[in-house]
């Protein structure tokens, strides 16, 4: 009898665990993307300026346009001044009622003195939203010692993917804390959710972004500051090398609008409903099977990239 009661109890516990897992999945997918209305972002920000790093291409540029559409003044930070000027011109042609400023900065420069100079420029305005988007990836997946670009590229990936969200957050948080309002969005990647073979440094740095953001949420949860992780899957951008959009692959503009709509409604998400669906389904797969699937995909991507590289070499 005691054994039977134990088995019945264990069965109820298992059912409860399954029900909780399914509820969490549906909540993560439907909550921020279907059921919950977007918050008043300007009110949550508490200031009229938004800073976007990596703002001249891809997701960062799309964030800048979307924030401008919502009435924020935008301060664009990227490496090349000519591209910053062009992006500024494009934004003002579409949203002439806002102000746009630029700051050229090479994020491969890890010197604290360089960051102090950049922060001095940024803190000239009241920053309500900080989008830490700038990032760098591999040219194509490969094992560590064969990564295209060698140790210089590995160093740059590590520097660009980890220092900006750390140091810019640290340098801008004081004014947000003083106002008891502000929004920080750290753009990571779904690659940080898994131990991605052939993407070792990229995957590891994106895991860093995820952990950093989660810890900052704990540190500032009573300061009126919203700190969010956005970890997208595939978006049609220059860095992803994907040109065509699809049901699972939005362009930057569609993604940025969707992602900003989730601010304040979820603290850690992919930013797009079909990306979230993919993530939740992948999480149901046992780790050893998931690792095998992801590794096979990376091996295929590498093979295609090497074939393309070989064709280009022959055509020269």
Swiss-Prot record:
InterPro entries, sorted: NAD(P)-bd_dom_sf (IPR036291), Sc_DH/Rdtase_CS (IPR020904), SDR_fam (IPR002347)
Reactions mediated catalytically: a very-long-chain (3R)-3-hydroxyacyl-CoA + NADP(+) = a very-long-chain 3-oxoacyl-CoA + NADPH + H(+); (omega-1)-methyl-(3R)-hydroxy-fatty acyl-CoA + NADP(+) = (omega-1)-methyl-3-oxo-fatty acyl-CoA + NADPH + H(+); a 17beta-hydroxy steroid + NADP(+) = a 17-oxo steroid + NADPH + H(+)
GO cellular component: apical cortex; endoplasmic reticulum
Positions that bind substrate: 189
Function of the protein: Required for branched-chain fatty acid synthesis (such as (omega-1)-methyl-fatty acids). Catalyzes the reduction of the 3-keto-fatty acyl-CoA intermediate that is formed in each cycle of fatty acid elongation. Very long-chain fatty acids (VLCFAs) serve as precursors for ceramide and sphingolipids. Involved in hormone production as it metabolizes 4-androstendione (androst-4-ene-3,17-dione) into testosterone and estrone into estradiol (17beta-estradiol) in vitro, but the physiological steroid substrate is unknown.
Stated family: Belongs to the short-chain dehydrogenases/reductases (SDR) family. 17-beta-HSD 3 subfamily.
Protein name: Very-long-chain 3-oxooacyl-coA reductase let-767
